[in-house]
């Protein structure tokens, strides 16, 4: 595969075309930029997995050279650890977040920008415009930081100039309203990034490999156009950068910068292809490229020189080795749930819903058990399959009973819409792994207490999942009412006009799915907003898709009754009737505790796993199965 041929960025020879994209690591790094041992372990795992170049978490530039000298020890240890695997490492340097700082940071420290701008998370608060002498000190600080980075054995630097952060704000007319030499036309707006590039070269050396990360377009009215983006690409090439790392978006359109499940794989490749046509230096592309065949095709067709993988490598650090060996079925897929981001926004360390070891590589090592036991797992959903996988890895003799005719549990209906194809990949991955590990899988087998007692296992994991909640409403028994799960599984068909009761993720994705099948949709939610429990980026994108599809959404609205031809609803002002052929229920789920309650006290060493314990997300089920099986 061409994906595994060497490539160059400036003088730096990289063993393949795979780059670990820069991602914030949350609690794995100190606020002053020092790397914790867990951070080094995290990057080492990706180096061991076979990536060619690792680009670090962004390091914010502030203060004098003594501030950056504190980075030296951690960066030196990182470079040594990564180099042991023949992998190169770059440090991304950032001028800061500008108007995109968190509200807490904004209130305690404040925010600066090229101009006075409303802050993204709290538009009532404004950034302070940087003075020219502050800009010049900031530029000088990049030189200091580059000196430290290059002295620590790091192989390259990447300049963060994307996503609407401070350097990108200077570059963008929408946010840069200055009238001095750092504003105005493109030449003025480029001055700050170009001065940073020269400062990095003074600090690290003119030939020290330097990548420029920027968004070719913001996909935002008034933001950067692709035409201007191509001009910028040519100008930074002329300034001496050695590679251009192309993405898109900003906080207003962040589902482009961190592509959601609703965008197609390789959604940003067309942008890198445009840049390739106007520059003569390597171009790095990024964005939902976790399919090895797609990544290979991008390189073969000359649409980019390098493939950057971000969340893909959180899900499976061994992706490069598995792809090179053609073991595609062994690649654990990113499902695009964005819990990795959600947890960091809660001030936690970087993590992954489908890979509990991410960020805890040393602490969560799976070791052989001291004594092999017989283990029964009841339920073949994500929690049950993960428990079976880990138990088998530890050397236990594992049997899994699933009452249905296929593995997957609630992932099966969740994976029906085309935009949830990653969930199908997760089912396949888990199924293949437990089969390869020798788990005895019995389908169409509903467990009873008597059967479990007859088997007499040492340990039982109950992973029977959850079932839909059926609300107590007048008319709930009518023939036009169907649970979302039954509709997705094809047990029932929807009419041409459909009302979905419930504006959570299941309800809204079901509505989008039905709209794509040509149905007319209405969503009714009792809370004051839909998708309350969905992380911001997926939520924002899905809300826009629902609006674009013409789906009518009622919030702060109760359903009073289901009729033969629709429902009667009420808000605080009035009641009204909405007509529809079909009423879909998506008001949540409840744990299926029938077996666990029956087993209570009759069999020792019984553990509930996943939704059986408490309904939750994929992350809850998989992490629960992982942690409990790891301790048995």
How would you label these PLM feature ranges?
Residues 289, 381-383, 406, 504-506, ...:
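Residue-level detector of alpha-helix initiation sites
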Residues 377-393, 495-521:
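Rossmann-like NAD(P)H-binding beta-loop-alpha module
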Residues 510, 529-539, 609-632:
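A conserved FAD-binding loop/helix module that cradles the flavin
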Residues 396-412, 519-531:
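Glycine-rich FAD pyrophosphate-binding loop
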Residues 424-469, 476-496, 516-598, 602:
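A Rossmann-like FAD-binding core segment of flavoenzymes
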Residues 28-29, 64, 167, 220, ...:
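Glycine/Thr-rich phosphate-binding loops of Rossmann-like dinucleotide-binding domains
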Residues 1-378, 382, 386, 390-393, ...:
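Flavin-dependent oxidoreductase catalytic cores
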């Amino acid at each position: 595969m061409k994906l595994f041929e060497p490539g160059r960025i400036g003088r730096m020879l990289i063993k393949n075309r795979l780059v670990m994209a820069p991602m914030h690591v949350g609690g794995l790094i100190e606020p002053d930029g020092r790397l914790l041992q867990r951070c080094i372990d995290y990057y080492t795992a990706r180096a061991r997995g076979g990536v060619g170049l690792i680009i670090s978490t962004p390091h914010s530039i502030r203060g004098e050279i003594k501030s950056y000298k504190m980075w030296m020890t951690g960066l030196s240890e990182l470079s040594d650890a990564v180099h042991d695997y023949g992998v190169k490492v770059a440090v991304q340097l950032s001028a800061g977040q500008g108007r995109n700082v968190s509200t807490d940071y904004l209130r305690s420290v404040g925010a600066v920008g090229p101009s006075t701008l409303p802050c993204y998370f709290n538009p009532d608060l404004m950034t302070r415009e940087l003075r020219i002498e502050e800009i010049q000190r900031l530029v000088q600080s990049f030189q200091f930081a580059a000196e430290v980075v290059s002295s620590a054995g790091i192989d390259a630097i990447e300049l963060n100039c994307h996503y609407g952060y401070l350097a990108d704000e200077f570059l963008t007319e929408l946010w840069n309203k200055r009238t001095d030499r750092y504003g105005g036309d493109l030449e003025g707006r480029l001055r700050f990034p170009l001065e940073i590039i020269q400062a990095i070269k003074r600090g690290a050396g003119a030939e020290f490999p330097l990548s420029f990360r920027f968004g070719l377009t913001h996909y935002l009215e008034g933001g950067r156009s692709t035409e201007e983006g191509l001009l910028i690409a040519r100008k930074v090439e002329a300034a001496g950068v050695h590679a251009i790392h192309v993405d898109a978006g900003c906080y207003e359109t962040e589902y482009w910068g961190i592509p959601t499940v609703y965008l197609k794989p390789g959604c940003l490749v067309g942008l890198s292809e445009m840049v390739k046509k106007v520059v003569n230096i390597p171009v790095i592309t990024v964005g939902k490229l976790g399919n090895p065949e797609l990544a290979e095709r991008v390189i073969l067709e000359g649409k980019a020189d390098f493939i950057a993988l971000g969340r893909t490598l959180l899900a499976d650090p061994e992706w490069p080795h598995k792809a090179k060996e053609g073991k595609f079925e062994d690649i654990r897929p990113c499902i695009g749930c964005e819990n990795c981001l959600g947890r960091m926004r809660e001030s936690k360390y970087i993590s992954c819903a489908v890979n509990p070891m991410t960020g805890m590589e040393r602490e969560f090592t799976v070791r052989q058990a001291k004594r092999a036991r017989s283990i029964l797992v009841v339920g073949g959903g994500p929690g049950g399959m993960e428990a079976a996988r880990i138990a088998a890895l530890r050397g236990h003799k594992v049997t899994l009973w699933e009452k249905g005719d296929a593995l997957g549990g609630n992932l099966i209906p969740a994976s029906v819409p085309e935009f949830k194809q990653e969930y199908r990949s997760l089912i396949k991955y888990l199924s293949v792994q437990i089969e390869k590990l020798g788990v005895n899988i019995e389908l169409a087998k509903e467990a009873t207490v008597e059967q479990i007692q007859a088997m007499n296992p040492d340990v039982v994991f109950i992973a029977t999942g959850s079932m839909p909640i059926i609300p107590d409403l007048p008319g709930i028994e009518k023939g036009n009412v169907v649970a979302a799960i039954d509709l997705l599984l094809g047990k029932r068909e929807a009419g041409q006009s459909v009302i979905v009761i419930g504006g959570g993720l299941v309800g809204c994705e079901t509505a989008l799915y039905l709209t794509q099948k040509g149905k007319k949709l209405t969503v009714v939610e009792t809370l004051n907003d839909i998708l309350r429990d969905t992380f911001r980026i997926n939520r924002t994108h899905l809300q826009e898709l629902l609006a674009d599809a013409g789906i009518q959404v009622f919030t702060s609205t109760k359903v009073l009754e289901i009729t033969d031809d629709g429902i009667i609803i009420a808000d605080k002002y009035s009641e009204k009737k909405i007509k529809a052929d079909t009423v879909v229920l998506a008001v949540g789920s409840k744990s299926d505790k029938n077996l666990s309650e029956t087993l209570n006290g009759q069999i020792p060493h019984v553990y509930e796993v996943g939704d059986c314990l408490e309904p939750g997300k994929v992350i809850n089920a998989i992490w629960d199965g992982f942690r409990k099986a790891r301790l048995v």
